[in-house]
């Protein structure tokens, strides 16, 4: 579709033009020295996050691994969702942060149905552009035969209700669901109770203090030891098949119904940044470019996700060898110019939806990979005032 390709063509044209214009200069060593020195001067004047992101990510990963061990023990015979090992998502696990302080370490905990239950994802056709909303319908399944037979479990479908009430815990339908659908807020409250109960048994509790923070759609907490602290947010999700796309508890709007689970591409995006990290030179500054430009735009009309999308597109176009210190200023100019061009033509393609050029290790459901590309700037098409305001940012 011609319209769908406009955004990528804008990015392609700008990047190629920039590289062609500078190709001759890059061959000369003298220019390399000047550009490298300029990049060094700019970087020295930038304030990077105080916290060591790699250290914070490792600490968070270790903590969630310990939680997972206890989740397995406590929930193995229950009828609550089965909690899988947490997956680090978001900017910190991608290797950057838009803020100097108050870094949030975000993880996604995949959930699978407990025995005697199945999950079915139902697409909400009333979803907005670029955001597919789902509901997770919970159904009971017969356990009279098969792997659960004789496993000290009564069949929810075929045993009398009186016998079930007297001899077995209630099904998931009666604990975390609203009208047969998994409820985000009930799930969050349940997870808070788990964290509060398990924390004293963890080795981290001996030297760290846990403070639970309020949230209706996730579990947020801060851990401190007097010298340093980490803020962690735990999201819950259900995987779509065997792909890297989930439906998650993170809402896109303030008034999202509690049975709505928006589609999230956070795991796929983390895998993309890991793919890039394996291919760039050791001194690559692609993350610092993203970090600096995002911080530059804080408080403007452009979201962090918009800037990240522009950079992800550029990372697939500009060779990985051209993100070194000597290229730092030029890459910042690329990001700025590409953002301006996308605003001007009122089109910025979503990086995951409909992108058929992603690395093979990123697994997408067929309907996501083959879908029509989604314009993140659709609101600028519909609202001339918003478009004029966005242009004025430059």
Which role does the model predict for each range below?
Residues 1-52, 66-83, 277-280, 292, ...:
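Terminal (often C-terminal) interaction modules
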Residues 57, 61, 65-81, 92, ...:
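Short amphipathic alpha-helical interaction elements and helix-loop-helix interfaces
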Residues 96-97, 132-343:
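Catalytic cores of NTP-dependent nucleotidyl/adenyl transfer enzymes across multiple folds
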Residues 84-90, 206-217, 309, 350-358:
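Acidic carboxylate-rich catalytic motifs and surrounding loops in phosphoryl-/glycosyl-chemistry enzymes
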Residues 102, 121-123, 207, 248-250, ...:
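Generic preference for flexible, low-structure residues
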């Amino acid at each position: 579709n011609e319209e769908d390709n406009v955004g990528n063509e804008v990015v392609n044209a700008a990047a190629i033009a920039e590289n062609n214009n500078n190709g001759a200069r890059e061959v000369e060593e003298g220019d390399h020295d000047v550009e490298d020195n300029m990049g060094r001067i700019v970087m020295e004047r930038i304030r990077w996050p105080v916290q060591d992101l790699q250290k914070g990510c490792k600490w968070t990963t270790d903590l969630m691994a310990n939680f997972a061990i206890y989740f397995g023990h406590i929930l193995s015979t229950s009828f609550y969702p089965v909690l899988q090992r947490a997956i680090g998502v978001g900017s910190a696990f991608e290797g950057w942060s838009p803020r100097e302080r108050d870094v949030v370490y975000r993880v996604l905990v995949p959930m699978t149905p407990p025995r005697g239950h199945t999950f079915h994802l139902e697409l909400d056709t009333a979803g907005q552009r670029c955001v597919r909303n789902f509901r997770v319908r919970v159904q009971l399944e017969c356990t009279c035969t098969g792997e659960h037979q004789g496993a000290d479990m009564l069949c929810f479908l075929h045993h009398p209700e009186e016998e079930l009430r007297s001899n077995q815990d209630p099904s998931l339908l009666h604990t975390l669901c609203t009208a047969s659908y998994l409820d985000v807020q009930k799930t969050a409250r349940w997870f808070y109770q788990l964290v509060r109960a398990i924390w004293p048994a963890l080795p981290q509790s001996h030297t760290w203090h846990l403070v639970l923070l309020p949230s209706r759609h996730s579990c947020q907490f801060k851990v401190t030891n007097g010298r340093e602290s980490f803020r962690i947010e735990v999201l819950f999700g259900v995987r779509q098949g065997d792909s890297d796309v989930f439906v998650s508890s993170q809402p896109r709007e303030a008034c999202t119904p509690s049975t709505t689970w928006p589609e999230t591409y956070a795991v796929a995006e983390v895998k993309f940044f890991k793919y890039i990290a394996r291919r760039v030179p050791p001194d690559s500054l692609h993350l610092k470019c993203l970090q600096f430009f995002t911080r530059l735009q804080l408080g403007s009309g452009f979201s962090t996700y918009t800037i990240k999308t522009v950079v992800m597109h550029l990372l697939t176009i500009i060779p990985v060898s051209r993100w070194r210190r000597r290229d730092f200023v030029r890459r910042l100019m690329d990001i700025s110019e590409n953002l301006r061009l996308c605003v001007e033509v009122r089109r910025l393609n979503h990086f995951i939806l409909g992108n058929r050029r992603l690395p093979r290790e990123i697994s997408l459901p067929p309907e996501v990979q083959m879908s029509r590309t989604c314009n993140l700037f659709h609101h600028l098409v519909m609202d001339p005032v918003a478009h004029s305001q966005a242009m004025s940012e430059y």
